[in-house]
Amino acid sequence: MAVSKLPVRSCLIDGEAIVCDENGLAVYELICRHDAGERAVLSAFDLLEPDGKDLRRRPIEKRKELLAQLLNGRKSISFFGEDGEIVFREACKLGCEGIVSKRLGSIYRSGRSPLWLKVKNPNAPTVKREAEEDWGR
C-alpha cells in the first residue's frame, strides 16, 4: 500500500524500509542494491503523529492499535505480547536478524531507551558480518 493511500492528510510513522528475500525475510544487503526501490516496502513499527495529533505520550499498546486501524488490516510488522525469550528463539529459528522488545505501557522516546531492548540473533548473516567487521577494527 502506498503511503499516499493512507486515510490521513499527514502522518509520522516509525518504521524501516526493507526488501525481503524469497522466504519473506528482510535482508539488509537487498535494500542496498541499486534496484531495491521497486521491491522496498515500509515495515511500520509505531504510529507517532496522525494528522498532527501527537501520540508519543500514549502507551505503546494504544499506538499499535491505532497503527493497525490506520493500515486497515494491511501487513505491517508483527507484534507479540508473549514471553520475549520464546519470541526470540522462534525468530532465530526463522533466521531473523533479531527482535526489539518494548515494555508494555511505554511511551515513545527518540533514540535508545531502557524500556526498549534490541536483541540480535548471533547466527544471522548480517550480525555475523557486523561481528567480523568489528573484530577487524
Language model region names:
Residues 1-137:
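Catalytic cores of nucleic-acid ligases and guanylyltransferases
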